[in-house]
Amino acid sequence: MQRVKKSVLVPYAAAAMFELVDRVEDYPQFLPWCGGAHATERPEGGKTARVDINYHGVRAHFTTDNVNHAGESIVVTLRDGPFRHLHGEWRFIALSPDACKVEFELAYEFTTHILEKVVGPVFSHIANTFVDAFVRRAEAIHAARP
């Protein structure tokens, strides 16, 4: 099983970073490997999200159930995709009204050895650069505001 654990301090409110991660539909705008994304609200709260990977000739998709704790965390659990196991959590810890710590943990395992060899390197790159991509997106959004 592969594991990724990242944390970063950012000069943005926890609620703003939560919203950025929660807006799955916006992922194709700033994640270069994301070929598409769609999310539907679930009656019990949270979302079901599908993310399409299209990166260096590798195409795959996965669907997750995301449980949201408004402004604080998003727990991601595999529903469908090329994984035997995928579980992740985003945490947004307020440090002040305008700063927070973002923590991201992900554990995943592909269903077959062949998928691990083909999709594994791409997904490893994605998982290890995920947090940085969201920080860059937050910087771009806040730089554009007057």
Task: Identify what each model region corresponds to.
Residues 78-129:
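Beta-strand/loop substructures that line and gate deep hydrophobic ligand-binding cavities in soluble
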Residues 38-80, 133, 137:
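Glycine-rich portal/gate segments that line the openings of hydrophobic small-molecule binding cavities
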Residues 135-146:
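Short, highly charged C-terminal tails/helix-capping segments
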Residues 10-14, 53-57, 68-70, 82-84, ...:
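Beta-strand elements of well-folded, non-transmembrane domains
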Residues 1-44, 144:
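Hydrophobic ligand-binding cavity/cleft-lining segments
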Residues 17-21, 27, 49, 102-104, ...:
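Hydrophobic pocket/interface hotspot
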Residues 14, 41-45, 68-71, 91-101:
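A short, structured loop/turn motif at beta-sheet edges
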Residues 6-8, 37-39, 62-67, 87-94:
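Hydrophobic/aromatic beta-strand elements that line small-molecule binding cavities or substrate pockets
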